[in-house]
From Swiss-Prot:
Self-association and partners: The 26S proteasome consists of a 20S proteasome core and two 19S regulatory subunits. The 20S proteasome core is composed of 28 subunits that are arranged in four stacked rings, resulting in a barrel-shaped structure. The two end rings are each formed by seven alpha subunits, and the two central rings are each formed by seven beta subunits. The catalytic chamber with the active sites is on the inside of the barrel.
Keyword set includes Nucleus: yes
PANTHER family registered for this protein in UniProt: PROTEASOME SUBUNIT ALPHA/BETA (PTHR11599)
Sorted UniProt keywords: Cytoplasm, Nucleus, Proteasome
Homology family: Belongs to the peptidase T1A family.
Highest taxon in the source lineage: Eukaryota
Protein name: Proteasome subunit alpha type-4-2
SMART domains assigned: Proteasome_A_N
Biological classification of the source: Eukaryota, Viridiplantae, Streptophyta, Embryophyta, Tracheophyta
Species for this entry: Oryza sativa subsp. indica
PROSITE patterns linked to this entry: PROTEASOME_ALPHA_1, PROTEASOME_ALPHA_2
Protein induction: Up-regulated in the leaf sheaths of rice plants grown from seeds that were inoculated with the nonpathogenic P.fluorescens strain KH-1.
GO biological process per UniProt: ubiquitin-dependent protein catabolic process
Length: 250
């Protein structure tokens, strides 16, 4: 029965479902996991890299973490070619706002604008939904640190801790059990690594398979900082959390 309704995004099934949107969400379920944890002094994003190779120039490639503006970053799960289009759209919108109003765009306003674009691709013929979900982490003067999650339907919501990608339901359940208000950034990093280590499909957890980024306020200046963890620092974090495992022989 579903085959009569799943060829176009503009046709509802008798049950009121848009199958193409649901299929886009299935694509995200096959992507590497990404977690976001909101702390009292920042936001932590951690992602699982699916592409690992000794030949890959890690300093020039990013698979999960992307900077949108000086105060806003995101983690991605899904089809990366789709994500790149939306990332460029988000960066352009942020720069236009800054040029017009001489201040950084509020985090939720940018998230809402991007989700409006995603929703439009579920409502018009000849288009397909973007097969990508985002975790947005940022800070603004209106609401402080914020964490948002969006999906291919164009829906978004604010979270204290969230997961997207493979095994996201199991990760979300663990976050619900272990998260508490008032976490420090250091505690948020430990929580995110712990959850990811138990939900990743990979049997070994190494620094080369993870990306970690933080959004926080620089002590003293109060400026928003976006910092990506280096593989060396990631290895130390894993060792400190007791999660470090030897990498398999190449």
């Amino acid at each position: 029965m579903s085959r009569r309704y799943d060829s176009r995004t503009t046709i509802f099934s008798p049950e009121g479902r848009l199958y193409q949107v649901e299929y886009a969400m299935e694509a995200i379920g096959n992507a590497g996991s990404a977690l976001g944890v909101l702390a009292a002094d920042g936001v932590v994003l951690v992602g699982e890299k699916k592409v690992t190779s000794k030949l890959l120039q890690t300093s020039r490639s990013a698979e999960k973490m992307y900077k949108i503006d000086s105060h806003l970053a995101c983690a991605v799960a899904g089809i990366m070619s789709d994500a790149n289009i939306l990332l460029n759209t988000a960066r352009l919108h942020a720069q236009r706002y800054a040029l017009s109003y001489q201040e950084p765009i509020p985090v939720e306003q940018l998230v809402q604008s991007l989700c409006d674009t995603k929703q439009g691709y579920t409502q018009f013929g000849g288009l397909r939904p973007f097969g990508v979900s985002f975790l947005f982490a940022g800070w603004d003067k209106h609401h402080g640190f914020q964490l948002y999650m969006s999906d291919p339907s164009g829906n978004y919501s604010g979270w204290k801790a969230a997961a997207v990608g493979a095994n996201s339901q199991a990760a979300q359940s663990m976050l619900k059990q272990d998260y508490r208000d008032g976490l420090t950034r250091e505690e948020a990093v430990a929580l995110a690594l712990k959850v990811l280590s138990k939900t990743m499909d990979s049997t070994s957890l190494t620094a080369e398979k993870l990306e970690l980024a933080e959004v926080f306020l620089q002590p003293g200046t109060g400026e928003v900082q976006y910092q990506v963890c280096s593989p060396e620092a990631m290895g130390k974090l894993l060792a400190k959390a007791g999660l470090s495992q030897p990498a398999p022989e190449a």
